[in-house]
């Protein structure tokens, strides 16, 4: 096995990366520097420095990436309206590129000769991390233990941790695979691996109440947007991080943003996960409804196509690509008039539009009213229908002729 002098480890303090530190030292004889990308995982950061050093890391970087994460990754994805396979709000997907970018920067700073990640060989994250690493340093060596070591399951990981006195906070019975950041919390594994099983929401959920425990009374909120970016909550201007934190609290209280999904992974198989995205779900709904008011028909319809491709690119780890940047440029243009306020009613998992306004609204009461007006001459509709139906008429006459 090739030896390295210094390895940068993408560290979370979870099971995978906790046991990787002693494994790297044992198998590569290298110095291990742990790097934590703080993308809003909050309480998970507590005690990480002590844990990493105790486990064998020579030092640890805890990099605050939350502001950049929200402004440069989350907000552009909301503007795009991107959902993978119509449901997944890409919480893990767009968190990986920003972390990988920082790993490369610290590797250069430290003079490291390899970067290591703890992603499974069956998952999407290995692709997301390595695409970004190769983008910023094509020559960087990458170590992916899950593709080389003898450990084949999370149960074996737990046993390795026990054998090597690595402190962990999970047991065989609570061994859900989780990923948490400011945007979402995902849950995979155990009983969720069997689609016939109903998720044990009362045991799984951390950000959100179950619908049974959500308040019995609705709550109204008002969101303000400027060029497709949420900038205020209930009339108060907030920075992106604070706004999302507040929406997570409010949405979580009402059981909003919980999805149970079977998705098609990039690497070929299907997987099932439960995702909690309370604040994000509110922002997506608000933004989409405001677009309905502000975008013209052709732009709106074409943007739906762009949104699908944008979601695929993000899901597949292709954030730092010319196509994603080009699509973002198009999306940015569409957002120039997506400004206004929207009132939402939140109730037991539901997000209900309760009214919206915009200085760029394309909705005209004068044209849309069912009452009498002096603008729209309904007689004009007959000529329009005759022209619009011409292809159908020609097709029908041809069919009659053949018969």
From Swiss-Prot:
UniProt xrefs under PROSITE patterns: ARGININOSUCCIN_SYN_1, ARGININOSUCCIN_SYN_2
Positions bound to L-citrulline: 88, 93, 124, 128, 177, 186, 263, 275
Domain of life: Bacteria
Keyword set includes Nucleotide-binding: yes
Catalysed reactions, as listed in the record: L-citrulline + L-aspartate + ATP = 2-(N(omega)-L-arginino)succinate + AMP + diphosphate + H(+)
GO biological process, one term: argininosuccinate metabolic process
Localization per record: Cytoplasm
EC number: 6.3.4.5
InterPro entries: Arginosuc_syn_C, Arginosuc_syn_N, Arginosuc_synth, Arginosuc_synth_CS, Arginosuc_synth_type_1_subfam, AS_cat/multimer_dom_body, Rossmann-like_a/b/a_fold
List of residues binding L-aspartate: 120, 124-125
Pfam families attached to this UniProt entry: Arginosuc_syn_C, Arginosuc_synth
Record-stated family: Belongs to the argininosuccinate synthase family. Type 1 subfamily.
HAMAP family: Arg_succ_synth_type1
Name the UniProt record assigns to this protein: Argininosuccinate synthase
Source organism per UniProt: Clostridium perfringens (strain ATCC 13124 / DSM 756 / JCM 1290 / NCIMB 6125 / NCTC 8237 / Type A)
Taxon lineage: Bacteria, Bacillati, Bacillota, Clostridia, Eubacteriales
């Amino acid at each position: 096995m090739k030896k390295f002098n210094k390895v940068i480890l993408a560290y979370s303090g979870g099971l995978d990366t906790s046991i990787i530190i002693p494994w790297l030292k044992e198998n590569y004889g290298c110095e291990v520097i742990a790097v934590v990308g703080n993308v809003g995982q909050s309480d998970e950061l507590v005690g990480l420095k002590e844990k990493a050093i105790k486990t064998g890391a020579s030092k640890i970087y805890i990099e605050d990436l939350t502001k950049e994460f929200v402004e440069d990754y989350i907000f552009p994805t909301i503007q795009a309206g991107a959902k993978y396979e119509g449901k997944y709000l890409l919480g893990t997907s767009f968190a990986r590129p920003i972390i990988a970018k920082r790993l490369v920067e610290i590797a250069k700073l430290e003079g490291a000769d390899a970067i290591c990640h703890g992603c499974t060989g069956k998952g999407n994250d290995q692709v997301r991390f390595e695409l970004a690493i190769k983008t910023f340093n094509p020559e960087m060596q990458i170590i992916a233990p899950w593709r080389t070591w003898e450990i084949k399951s999370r149960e074996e990981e737990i046993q390795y941790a026990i054998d090597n006195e690595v402190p962990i906070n999970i047991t065989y019975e609570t061994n859900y695979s989780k990923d948490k950041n400011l945007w979402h919390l995902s849950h995979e594994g155990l009983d969720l691996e069997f689609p016939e099983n109903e998720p044990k929401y009362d045991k799984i959920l951390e950000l959100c109440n179950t619908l049974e425990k959500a308040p019995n009374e609705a709550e109204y909120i008002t969101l303000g947007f400027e060029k497709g970016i949420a900038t205020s909550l209930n009339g108060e201007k907030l920075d992106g991080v604070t706004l999302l934190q507040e929406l997570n609290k409010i949405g979580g209280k009402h059981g909003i943003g919980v999805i149970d999904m079977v998705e098609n992974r990039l690497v070929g198989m299907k997987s099932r996960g439960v995702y909690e995205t309370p604040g994000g779900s509110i922002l997506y709904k608000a933004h989409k409804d405001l677009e309905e008011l502000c975008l013209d028909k052709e732009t709106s319809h074409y943007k739906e196509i762009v949104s699908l491709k944008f979601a695929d690119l993000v899901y597949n780890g292709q954030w730092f690509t010319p196509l994603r940047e080009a699509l973002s440029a198009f999306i940015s243009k569409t957002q120039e008039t997506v400004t206004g306020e929207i009132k939402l009613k939140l109730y037991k998992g539901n997000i209900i539009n309760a009214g919206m306004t915009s200085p760029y609204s394309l909705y005209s009461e004068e044209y849309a009213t069912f009452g009498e007006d002096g603008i729209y001459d309904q007689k004009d509709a007959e000529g329009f229908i005759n022209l619009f139906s011409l292809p159908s008429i020609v097709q029908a006459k041809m069919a009659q002729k053949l018969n």
